[in-house]
Design a protein with these regions (language model features):
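Active-site diphosphate/adenylate-binding microenvironment
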Residues: 2-62
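Flexible, low-complexity linker and terminal segments
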Residues: 4, 194-246
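Short catalytic-loop micro-motif centered on adjacent basic/acidic residues
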Residues: 9-11, 84-86, 160-165
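Structural motif
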Residues: 35-38, 80-83, 108-112, 151, ...
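Thiamine diphosphate
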Residues: 42-119, 171-174
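Short, hinge-like loop/turn segments at secondary-structure boundaries
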Residues: 55-57, 102, 127-131, 179, ...
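Conserved thiamine diphosphate
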Residues: 79, 127-179
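ATP/pyrophosphate-binding catalytic subdomain of soluble kinases
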Residues: 159-213
Length: 246
């Protein structure tokens, strides 16, 4: 009911761990799959929606254009929950303009980037999120500074930003649940190692490197249920509000 078709991704791909976390989060939240619309672009990550929530709606768009499709679908049907899946190539290169403006619109959706720092479908070239100095499978060293998607989302005013690792299910599942509860644009950047082209010594997106350099900034083991805070005010006026944490 919550799972999808059999994955055709490489054995050990971080994306499959993210798919499993999405299944777990949706099951824990009792989200009905037929009320979910999955949207994606092009890339290994964009194949992933086929591997979870098989009874949901889905649309595989052209490269980098998932946000536009999500915007149109959201305007046409406000009753569905929109889950966008993208990759670092799909978002940080050809889709960068779309990414910027979907944040600007504060579209109500979860936008998840499966970030492996390379183009897995085209033999592992460095993507725009590959760190300077990181080495790929051929030993080539990346000379360019990485685009930090989480920092960029914060700078652009995204109302929910989170970052995690595909190998840390205990953090990722609660983070997904928090993003799904958010009333607005929720962005998740998940480091997801490519076992075929970018899991080698010298890569900063490998399983070993990420595990050695992980640093949790907060615990995500409990997400309290809260009532949505609403108010009304005259144009040009200011009203003080008390948030849940006081």
């Amino acid at each position: 009911y919550y799972e999808g078709s059999l994955s055709t991704l490489c054995a050990g791909c971080g994306h499959d761990s993210i798919n499993a976390a999405i299944v777990e989060a949706c099951w824990q939240m009792n989200i009905e799959p037929h009320k979910v619309a999955k949207l994606s672009g092009i890339g290994c990550s964009s194949k992933s929606p086929a591997y979870f929530l098989s009874n949901s709606h889905g649309f595989n768009s052209v490269h980098g254009r998932m946000p536009s499709v999500a915007t149109g679908a959201n305007l046409a049907n406000r009753d569905l929950f929109y889950f966008g899946v993208s990759g670092d190539g799909d978002t940080a290169s050809i889709g960068m303009g779309q990414f910027v403006h979907v944040i600007r619109r504060n579209l109500k959706m979860v936008y998840l980037v499966m970030n492996n720092g390379c183009y897995g479908l085209t033999k592992g070239q460095d993507s725009a999120t590959a760190d300077a100095g990181s080495k790929n499978k051929t030993g080539h060293e990346n000379l360019f500074a990485a685009i930090d998607l989480a920092s960029l989302a914060i700078e652009l005013g995204a109302t929910f930003v989170g970052q995690s690792f595909s190998g840390d299910k205990e953090q990722l599942v609660p983070l997904l649940k928090a993003a799904m509860r958010h009333n607005g644009f929720a962005f998740l950047n998940v480091i997801s190692p490519c076992v075929t082209f970018n899991n080698n010594t010298g890569s900063t997106k490998s399983y070993d490197y990420v595990r050695e350099h992980m640093a949790a900034t907060a615990t995500m083991d409990f997400i309290p249920m809260m009532h949505e805070i609403k108010t009304s005010y005259e144009s040009g006026s200011v009203k003080d509000l008390t948030m849940h944490d006081g």
